[in-house]
């Protein structure tokens, strides 16, 4: 077994986003764990390099022993701020800027939710926020639906990658529309990261 097969999602083809080469194609979050220790052990076992942090839901005070950030080594993991829970472009942009001011890098997983029940994205607001944040120097990874036209517009708006959902967040339904995801992948010139509902 080669070293690359030991790293989650690794292939022999480099995975590059906005000039940064990542050793793993798997990204994991920090939510829903019972304890910080469980979170750390799960992330470590995953082999992921990129860890998303929902800015609205965590303390950005790294000195707090009970905070998520106190348990994640930034020299080991690439911490990606996430605007999960934001329902307007203005709200998402506010939290992206807050994360950067608090010491995160300029990367952001941009989410603008349009429906509270399904957590499907508001693509019009997402496009607005993407255009503005990309203009401010953010590297935007946009959580979106599996629509090719929206993905193309996000590329034009300055996104560095799109993250089309496999199925609604938390549904565990897996990849519902492989044709749409495949079409997006073939048509876009930058990375496509399948996100949400992928199951376990």
Which residues fall in each region the model found?
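A short beta-strand-loop structural module common to alpha/beta enzyme folds
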Residues: 50-57
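Short, well-ordered coil/turn residues at beta-beta hairpins
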Residues: 29-30, 54
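Short secondary-structure junction/hinge motifs that connect adjacent elements
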Residues: 59-61
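Alpha/beta enzyme core
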Residues: 12-17, 32-50, 63-78, 86-200
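N-terminal amphipathic alpha-helix/helix-capping segment at the start of soluble metabolic enzymes
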Residues: 2-29, 66-67
């Amino acid at each position: 077994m080669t070293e690359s097969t030991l790293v989650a999602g690794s292939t022999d083809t480099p995975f590059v986003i906005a000039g940064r080469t990542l050793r793993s194609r798997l990204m994991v979050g920090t939510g829903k764990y019972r304890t910080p220790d469980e979170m750390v052990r799960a992330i470590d076992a995953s082999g992921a390099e990129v860890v998303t942090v929902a800015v609205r839901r965590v303390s950005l005070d790294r000195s707090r022993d009970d905070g998520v950030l106190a348990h994640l080594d930034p020299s080991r993991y690439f911490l990606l701020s996430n605007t999960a829970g934001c329902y307007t472009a203005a709200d998402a942009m506010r939290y992206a800027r807050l994360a950067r001011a608090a010491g995160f890098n300029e990367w952001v997983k941009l989410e603008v939710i349009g429906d509270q029940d399904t957590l499907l994205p508001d693509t019009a607001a997402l496009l607005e926020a993407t255009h503005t944040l990309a203009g401010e120097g953010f590297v935007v990874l946009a959580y979106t639906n599996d629509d090719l036209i929206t993905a193309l517009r996000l590329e034009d708006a300055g996104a560095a990658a799109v993250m089309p959902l496999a199925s609604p967040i938390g549904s565990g339904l897996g990849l519902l529309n492989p044709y749409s995801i495949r079409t997006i992948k073939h048509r876009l010139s930058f990375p496509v990261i399948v996100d949400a509902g992928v199951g376990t």
